Amino acid sequence: MCGKRWVGLTLAAATVVAVSGCHTAFGPEPLDRDWRVYEGVRVSFFVRPGSFAEQNVARLSEVLEDQFTSTVATLRLAYAGHLHAYAYNSGAEAHFTSDAAGRAYPETESFRFVAVPPMGDNLFQLMSHEANHVVVIDGLGRAGTYFMTEGLASALLSETFHRSGRHFLFPWTRSHRAQLPRMATLIDDGGWGRTAQDTAYKSSASFLAWLIDTYGSDRLRQIYPLNSDQMLDRIASIYGRPLDALEAEWLVFCENFAG
């Protein structure tokens, strides 16, 4: 189905030499030897032999290559690194509490995630979210808030292969309007921590996706590194509108979004 489009994706080695001394702050735990690596242009994909991920590595790699290109273009990044994606067979194997989980390690341009059936939007979204953490942090440095760190990774989702980006976020905002926290609450790290995780992630992603679409990424880059207090103080001068006005404009847009 996509073999001709992936002539550049090659099996580099049957096994990967174990890596020692990796701390979780800088990369995945020390690797065992039971991996196969498939090399792409911008992504090296590590999979378990015979796994669901290996059976679908061409499409998974295609999604990540597209996401890499999209994120760099949207944020106008100079980043030209190479990602290392580790696909685990279960949350337990990756030391996560569920199968819907991943973790990024920007210092080593790597991330790990759980790849389980079905092949589709949820898996692509999870994988792309973690990849975006690496690309964004290595391209811009670390964000000043949880709001920006987690929200932007989903706000930047390319929809070439799925509809888990804007076509999900804006209708979700409309249907959950009564439960939405204020953006000022999410920008504050304390308020973020008191908000249900799913609501915090989706609300912030929706707002930031709209902000990029409406006002461009250059202004967003200015608020990206600011801490909670700085962002709340400076967002009006950077955007020419106070946060409350931006939030109201976003909600009207989502209410009228037709896809």
Residue ranges and their predicted role:
Residues 1-10:
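Bacterial N-terminal signal peptides that target proteins for export
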Residues 23-25:
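Bacterial signal peptide processing site
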Residues 18-21:
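C-terminal motif of bacterial Sec signal peptides marking the signal peptidase cleavage site
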Residues 27-145, 231-233:
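Juxtacatalytic substrate-recognition/specificity segment
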Residues 99-111, 122, 139-259:
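Acidic/His/Gly-enriched intrinsically disordered linker/tail segments
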